[in-house]
Amino acid sequence: MLFIELLKAIFFGVIEGVTEWLPISSTGHLILVQEFIRLHQDKAFMEMFNIVIQLGAIIAVIVIYFERLNPFQPGKSPQQIRLTWQLWLKVAIACIPSIIIAVPLDDWFEAHFNHMLPIAIALIVYGVAFLWIEKRHQTLEPRVVKLSRMSYKTAFFIGCFQVLSIIPGTSRSGATILGAIILGASRTVAADFTFFLAIPTMFGYSGLKALKFFIDGNHLTLSQLLVLLVASLTAFAVSLYVIKLLTDYVKKHDFTVFGRYRIVLGSLLIVYSVFKSLF
């Protein structure tokens, strides 16, 4: 039984590692996959699992970008150190809207929108948004082509877009990438800032979910701990590849393919929801 659970954990880790960074909603995909492949765990654990599993993906960002994000990295010039601290300040500023808005409202949105139909609608809405924005920006030159040129004001408004991801199916990376592009950032800058913003956002969110799990009187069994560790380690390994793949992809392509994917998947899920309610 535990062996089967660990195999499922590996599968969920792969899903998380791929969908956390592509703008197609990792939490939405995990919830959808669990319609067909279920871990034999209680509801409280699964609610925590769907979020904390993202830590593996976040650690992959730290590993890949450690030198760039570390202001104490040996060999950095004073100017590079200053730019690194400025980057972290921009990330901190971008976190403010989520702290003020998303954290207090998270439980309410999870209770009312953490279902297949709202997820499907969110997939379609943001899929259409990606297609519209990419078409609109085809002839426009981005104003922000380097992270060092991003203003603190722009960082704050990107953080405001991140708040939209409180709705399951939206995609945190999708919301911030869309916001960054709308605000004049290049696709490369949008993707990079999304990666960096994920570090404090998801560490904080995962920490709150884990804390709530234990405050509510729940305890991790050994099998649950193994499932969580295996899924997180798998998400970490897969993310190492997917992050590099996406950074290479956005240098030559736009996000249209992800918009189309979201629309197709969302439409299929609506059809599935209708049939499920009828039969």
UniProtKB/Swiss-Prot annotation:
One of the GO BP terms on file: regulation of cell shape
Location in the cell: Cell membrane
Protein keywords: Antibiotic resistance, Cell membrane, Cell shape, Cell wall biogenesis/degradation, Hydrolase, Membrane, Peptidoglycan synthesis, Transmembrane, Transmembrane helix
Top-level taxon of origin: Bacteria
Transmembrane segments: 2-22, 44-64, 85-105, 113-133, 163-183, 188-208, 225-245, 255-275
GO CC list: plasma membrane
InterPro entries given in the database record: UppP (IPR003824)
EC number(s) recorded for this UniProt protein: 3.6.1.27
Membrane topology: Multi-pass membrane protein
Top enzyme class: hydrolase
GO molecular function, one term: undecaprenyl-diphosphatase activity
Function: Catalyzes the dephosphorylation of undecaprenyl diphosphate (UPP). Confers resistance to bacitracin.
NCBIfam families xrefs: PRK00281.1-5
Comment field (misc): Bacitracin is thought to be involved in the inhibition of peptidoglycan synthesis by sequestering undecaprenyl diphosphate, thereby reducing the pool of lipid carrier available.
Family (UniProt): Belongs to the UppP family.
Name of protein: Undecaprenyl-diphosphatase
Species, as recorded: Streptococcus equi subsp. zooepidemicus (strain H70)
Gene name in the database record: uppP
